[in-house]
A protein has these predicted regions:
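Recognition helix of helix-turn-helix/homeodomain-like DNA-binding domains
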Residues: 36-50
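Short C-terminal boundary/hinge segments that cap the last helix of small helical domains
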Residues: 65-74
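Short, basic-rich loop-to-helix N-cap that marks the start of a DNA-contacting helix
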Residues: 49-62
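A short, Lys/Arg-rich alpha-helix, primarily the initiator
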Residues: 1-23
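Short basic helix-loop element that most often maps to the first helix and adjoining turn
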Residues: 15-32, 59
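Conserved hydrophobic/aromatic packing and binding residues within compact polymer-binding modules
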Residues: 17, 31-32, 42-45, 71
Length: 74
């Protein structure tokens, strides 16, 4: 069960991923390809509709060409 505090954190993480993707001028499709994850999975992450695993977060960071810790700078 996800409580309100966790939900806010998941949404903030998704917003950070979207912000970084847009800074890099990447489409969701391109970032998903670079991250080697499904486009729908990336969409759910950005919308804050899923709690991503550490491996998913790591894949997204790799796709963005950033260290994993950058995704948590929010």
């Amino acid at each position: 069960m996800i409580n309100n505090k966790d939900e806010a954190l998941i949404k903030a993480f998704g917003a950070r991923v979207r912000e970084l993707r847009k800074q890099k001028l990447l489409s969701m499709e391109k970032l998903a390809e670079l991250s080697e994850i499904d486009y729908r999975q990336l969409s759910y992450v950005e919308l804050g509709d899923t709690n991503p695993t550490i491996s998913t977060a790591s894949a997204i960071a790799k796709g963005l060409g950033l260290p994993l810790k950058e995704l948590f700078d929010f």
